[in-house]
């Protein structure tokens, strides 16, 4: 069983640190492209951050989304997103910022139009929520603070458990993961909402876990070979190789689970799952090729 789970043998000798420059170039290019997309194209902010209205409906029979989109679109009340919510009878209508239309009036207008679109398919309104621009801005600020505090927490934890150099390497790798993931969100125009922020926080924890496993093995090997004249580069390479099989198997299992969620989970959960799919790929890559490379680079610079 153990051999079956050993995707890559522990005695493999891949020179990851020898390829660190290549990894840094690839990551540098991806970060530059991601930042360019984020600052030029921007993120497709959802109602949570930009403000707007959410209306959840439940029909007696499966709803015709194309008819609903065309009918509501004819009202010309701003950006509209209409999608199923869980099953074909449940519909979620998202409206962007409207032209200062009171919520009650907006709700009446939409209800009347919905009844006109498909009079033979009765519906009930399960909820109506409105997020104002001020609340949206406040949520943006809180989301950024959540990501910042998560990274500060990681810095403190890794610095205490290992040493400051490892903490710097881990933080830079996490920032790398978040920036590139945001770049893909911008590129694909996926909706950026609170569930995506939750996915980014989950990504930070997931990527850190993989990095900690590698760092822990490096620390053990440094202690075990303290009296031997072994190059730190060889120690770090050996540690990455020993944990490589575990890292890849864990990442693949998580990746396919989240990929299934993205494909079959419906439109509402798609941005969350997409963020994790990209994050797992980038996070696994950074745990193997970036985090340890950064630690080695910093250690090398300190010796000069």
UniProtKB/Swiss-Prot annotation:
**Which residues belong to the signal peptide in this entry?**
none
Gene Ontology CC terms, in alphabetical order: plasma membrane
Q: What is this protein called?
A: Protein translocase subunit SecF
Gene designation:
secF
Which family does the entry's similarity section mention? Belongs to the SecD/SecF family. SecF subfamily.
* Subunit comment: Forms a complex with SecD. Part of the essential Sec protein translocation apparatus which comprises SecA, SecYEG and auxiliary proteins SecDF. Other proteins may also be involved.
Please give the biological process terms from Gene Ontology that the record holds: intracellular protein transmembrane transport; protein targeting; protein transport by the Sec complex
Q: Which GO terms describe its molecular function?
A: protein-transporting ATPase activity
NCBIfam families in the cross-refs: 2A0604s01, transloc_SecF
What is its subcellular localisation?
A: Cell inner membrane
Give the originating organism.
Answer: Calditerrivibrio nitroreducens (strain DSM 19672 / NBRC 101217 / Yu37-1)
Listed SUPFAM superfamilies: Multidrug efflux transporter AcrB transmembrane domain
């Amino acid at each position: 069983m153990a051999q079956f789970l050993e995707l890559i043998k522990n005695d493999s000798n891949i020179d990851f640190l020898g390829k660190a420059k290549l990894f840094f170039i690839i990551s540098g290019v991806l970060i530059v492209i991601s930042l360019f997309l984020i600052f030029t194209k921007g993120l497709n902010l959802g109602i949570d951050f930009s403000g707007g209205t959410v209306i959840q409906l439940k029909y007696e029979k499966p709803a015709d989304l194309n008819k609903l989109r065309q009918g509501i679109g004819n009202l010309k009340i701003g950006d509209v997103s209409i999608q199923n919510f869980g099953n074909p009878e449940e519909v979620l209508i998202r409206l962007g910022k409207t032209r200062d239309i009171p919520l009650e009036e907006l709700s009446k207008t939409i209800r009347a139009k919905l009844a006109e679109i498909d009079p033979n398919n009765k519906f009930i309104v399960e909820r109506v929520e409105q997020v104002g621009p001020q609340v949206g801005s406040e949520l943006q600020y809180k989301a950024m603070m959540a990501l910042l505090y998560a990274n500060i927490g990681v810095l403190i934890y890794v610095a205490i458990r290992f040493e400051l150099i490892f903490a710097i390497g881990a933080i830079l790798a996490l920032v790398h993961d978040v920036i590139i993931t945001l770049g893909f969100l911008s590129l694909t125009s996926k909706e950026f909402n609170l569930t995506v922020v939750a996915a980014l926080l989950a990504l930070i924890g997931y990527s850190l876990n993989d990095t900690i496993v590698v760092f822990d093995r490096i620390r053990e090997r440094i202690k075990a070979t303290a009296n031997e004249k072994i190059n730190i580069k060889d120690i770090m390479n050996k540690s990455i190789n020993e944990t490589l099989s575990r890292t890849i198997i864990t990442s693949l299992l998580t990746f396919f689970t989240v990929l299934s969620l993205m494909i079959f989970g419906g439109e509402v959960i798609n941005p969350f799952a997409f963020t994790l799919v990209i994050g797992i790929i980038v996070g696994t890559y950074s745990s193997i090729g970036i985090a340890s490379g950064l630690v080695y680079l910093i250690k090398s610079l300190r010796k000069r």
